[in-house]
Regions:
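Charge-rich, low-complexity N-terminal segments
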Residues: 1-49, 55-122
């Protein structure tokens, strides 16, 4: 992996860490009272944009509301990242719902159902 790619990954990890710290207590929006976690951040090579994948435990409405709340707070989050990370340029943040955990849970549920419906042969 090239040093540039390593840097983007490191910056993405640092951004995710700081956003999670903000979610743990600094962001006071009722739409963020459900379990919300920045699961991954992908930073573009030019460092101008970052896709922030957000995992939300809740209903579809709660998930949608949490993404809207984060988009509304993106200016504040970005200013905080400037101070905390001391980067020359903090990327513009784009929040996306991370459905990977839901897919894992769905697959596990389907596998359990298959196992229950088809017991092992004696």
């Amino acid at each position: 992996m090239s040093p540039a790619n390593q840097r983007h990954e490191r910056v993405g990890e640092e951004i995710a860490h700081e956003i999670n710290a903000m979610l743990a207590g600094e962001l006071k929006d009722p739409r963020l009272e459900v379990s919300v976690v920045a699961s991954e951040v992908r930073v573009q090579p030019d460092m101008k944009h970052a896709r922030v994948f957000i995992s939300v435990k809740g209903t579809n409405k709660e998930q949608s509301d949490a993404i809207k709340a984060l988009e509304h707070a993106s200016g504040y989050i970005r200013r905080e990242l400037v101070e905390r990370l001391q980067l020359r340029r903090v990327p513009e943040l784009h929040f996306t719902l991370d459905l990977s955990q839901e897919h894992v849970e769905r697959i596990e549920r389907l596998l359990k159902e298959m196992k229950k419906d088809n017991p092992p042969a004696p």
